[in-house]
A protein has these predicted regions:
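Transmembrane helix-loop boundary segments of multi-pass membrane transporters
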Residues: 2-3, 7, 66-81, 140-167, ...
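Helix-loop-helix module between adjacent transmembrane segments
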Residues: 53, 76-182, 252-260, 269, ...
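Extracellular/periplasmic helix-exit of transmembrane alpha-helices
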Residues: 210-226, 288-338, 416-420, 477-489
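Terminal cytosolic tails of multi-pass membrane transporters
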Residues: 478-633, 645, 654-689
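Loop-to-transmembrane helix boundary motifs in multi-pass membrane proteins
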Residues: 113-121, 132, 162-168, 373-422, ...
Length: 689
């Protein structure tokens, strides 16, 4: 299905709005701190919507479509393994609270303060290389999504030359994201990502109701029941033939989520942007509510497409989808484009335009954030540490913009030439492991263990990156391209002939192995180094090192996780109440409203986790019929829909309040040209190199 003029008008309006806002935000960007971290002025609602959009991305939508198309509702069941982990990480402020206390603008700046300058440079190089390789496929996947969804031709003729449509679509999307980023840096990114986030939330709800009008709930279930018995889209305990996205996948991902929490620097500007550590913590907590509407998109849209492709009454639409897919030679790209192509057959004019605009918004919000992050990391953590003298503000901003432009050029070229040979999620994991393999140990150890040493950091990061690169080479180069020839050349080699046709480990499994090895080496080499304990109060700006602009009382180890100062002398009731809040992670910075949000979040996530545990026990011991599972999924969708609608309205109000506060604060803020992410010699806590 091709787009109607109404659809193009909707897309054009969105693009004009984004560019207009970006030009207006340029006047607010007056310093390096503005460009890198929004001058640390963002509130919770602004953060949770903008950062959520930065992490969404058209490529993430495509990856989720792959996952839920293959595993169906059952993927949501195993995904509940992640629920308590996300809850604990968000509610405790794990990593993000202490990281914000360090006042570092990039993670590698924290590495220099905590470990050494040489390690900062090494970690910055790894983060940059891992990041641009990971980001390198974004433009291509996004462009293909738009091409097949909008029904654009695969090739176009320009001056007699036949060119793939992929290139101009990628160029357009990258140019748009680049314009937003270069104009206003992190300030423009926060503002435009927030507005795009609100737009996406609304479009998701509209899309859900329109699709439900096309395919009823009963028809949806009928279509899902046509899946093979051992690849059920309804019953999570009948998935013996499901490819990749099974229980083992989610268990490993659960561990990696803890290990690498906030370690990935694709949106590093948001880590430094909160106005206080408490606002950063609340933004993470509110993310659960924001995610409800996104869950509707990720889970239900691919299931509607699955039903359409299997129900006889949609045979015409299914034939059109299959005809388009048959023209795609690469089997992995064919898998990725099945759902986008199917969605184009289900939505009417107008809604098609809204959905296309949503995909473009998701793409731009991720592109501008990643361009900003990897370009900034290259300058701040690779180039700047080599300089003996700081750059002027103007030269520093110019260098940042040049680096960001360079990242965009690399992504464009890489997307044109790299042949993606596995699921998007798997590629994310293994390319991310080049940096994340060791970074999780280095970050958590650096923030929470005073005996973590620079030797342990070097060991974890070095070994982790080597193992990850080895995994990428084995799976994507040696196994598919060299192993078949080796088997032909050495037919008598038994061990060579015994090797499987495909590499036995996927990207997630390899990432898990890398993380375990890195943790072991961080602990081992830190203990062997026998360095004196690090001054954690100085690192975290506590007690005599407290910084006034946090706008709160100095934090101690007890108050960080919620020690409310009510003692026995204040009465047994107050003492018990204080102990209760302490145990669930509430501190003095929480208002009554914050506490209500916090408790609801705990209750909501706990309900679904215990339902998962009890349901799994019943399914294994007694068994649950498909009819029982269908009732559960109906209940889940209804609850998700209610929260999705409510949170969209709630965050619309709170987000615009934060947006106006941000603009007001930036207009009156005093800029400090020395606040540029550099580290002075007296700030080093270990080596003075």
């Amino acid at each position: 299905m091709t787009l109607h003029w109404i659809d193009w008008a909707i897309i054009g309006t969105l693009l004009a709005l984004l560019l207009g806002i970006a030009f207006l935000s340029k006047s607010l960007t007056r310093s390096v701190a503005d460009f890198l971290a929004g001058n640390r002025c963002a509130g919770r609602y602004l953060l949770t919507m903008a950062d959520g959009m930065a992490g969404l991305g058209a490529i993430s939508i495509a990856a989720n479509f792959e996952q839920f198309y293959e595993a169906g509702f059952a993927a949501a069941w195993w995904g509940q393994i992640l629920a308590p982990i996300g809850l604990v990480l968000a509610l405790s402020g794990f990593v993000i609270y202490r990281y914000r206390e360090t006042r570092a603008m990039t993670m590698a700046q924290f590495f220099e303060v905590r470990y050494s300058r040489r390690f900062r440079i090494f970690a910055g190089i790894l983060a940059f290389l891992s990041g641009i390789l990971n980001y390198g496929i974004f433009p291509a996947v996004t462009a293909r999504f738009i091409i097949y969804f909008c029904g654009l031709p695969e090739q176009i003729e320009v001056l007699g030359w036949t060119l793939p449509t992929l290139a101009p679509v990628m160029l357009f999307l990258l140019s748009l994201a680049l314009t937003l980023t270069l104009l206003g840096g992190q300030i423009a990114i926060i503002i435009t990502d927030f507005l795009q986030g609100q737009f996406v939330q609304i479009v998701i709800l509209i899309t859900f109701f329109v699709m439900l009008s096309q395919i009823s709930w009963s028809d949806l279930i009928t279509g899902l029941q046509m899946a093979p018995e051992q690849a059920s889209r309804i019953n999570p305990f009948k998935q013996g033939e499901t490819k990749g996205f099974n229980i083992a996948f989610f268990i490993i991902v659960a561990g990696l989520n803890i290990y690498g929490f906030k370690a990935w620097q694709g949106s590093q500007g948001y880590n430094a942007a909160p106005k206080s550590p408490h606002e950063a913590k609340m933004a993470n907590i509110l993310g659960m509510f924001r995610g409800q509407a996104l869950f509707l998109l990720s889970m239900l849209v691919p299931l509607f497409v699955f039903a359409m492709l299997h129900l006889p009454e949609f045979s015409v639409q299914a034939a059109a989808v299959n005809e388009t897919l048959a023209s795609i030679d690469n089997p992995q790209i064919r898998e990725q484009m099945r759902v986008p192509t199917g969605v184009g057959q289900l939505l009417p004019a107008g809604v098609m335009g809204l959905f296309a605009a949503m995909i473009i918004a998701a793409a731009v919000s991720t592109d501008d954030t990643y361009l900003h992050s990897w370009g900034s990391i290259f300058v701040q953590d690779v180039i700047m540490p080599f300089r003996n003298r700081p750059l002027s503000r103007r030269a520093h901003l110019c260098l940042l913009r040049v680096a960001i432009f360079g990242v965009a050029v690399f992504a464009f070229v890489f997307s044109l030439v790299f042949p993606l040979s596995e699921y998007i999620f798997m590629y994310f994991q293994i390319t991310g492991a080049i940096y994340l393999g060791g970074a999780g140990a280095v970050i958590i150890g650096g923030l929470y263990w005073k005996r973590g040493s620079v030797e342990g950091a070097w060991a974890a990061m070095s070994i982790g990156s080597v193992l990850a690169v080895t995994g990428i080479a084995l799976r994507n180069i040696i196994w598919p391209h060299f192993l078949p020839d080796w088997k032909l050349d050495f037919p008598n080699s038994q061990w060579l002939q015994a090797l499987p046709e495909t590499f036995p480990l996927n990207g997630v499994e390899m990432s898990g192995i890398v993380a375990l090895v890195a943790v072991f080496n961080y602990i081992l080499f830190s203990l062997l180094s026998r360095r004196p304990p690090v001054n954690m109060d100085k690192l975290l700006h506590r007690r005599q090192y407290a910084v006034e602009d946090f706008n709160r009382q100095p934090v101690t180890d007890e108050t960080e996780y919620g020690f409310c100062e009510a003692s026995a002398e204040a009465g047994p009731t107050l003492a018990k109440r204080a102990l209760f809040w302490k145990r669930i992670g509430v501190n003095r910075n929480f208002s009554k409203g914050d506490k209500a949000i916090y408790v609801f979040n705990i209750g909501f996530s706990s309900f679904f986790f215990f339902a998962f545990v009890i349901g799994s026990v019943i399914a294994v011991t007694v068994g649950i019929s498909d009819a029982g599972w269908i009732q559960w999924w109906a209940f889940t969708v209804i609850v998700t829909l209610i929260l999705g609608v409510g949170s969209t309205i709630w965050f619309l109000i709170g987000g615009f309040k934060d947006l106006f506060d941000l603009i007001k604060t930036l207009r009156g803020a005093l800029r400090d040209d020395e606040d540029d992410g550099s580290v002075q010699r007296d700030e080093h806590l270990q080596e003075k190199d």
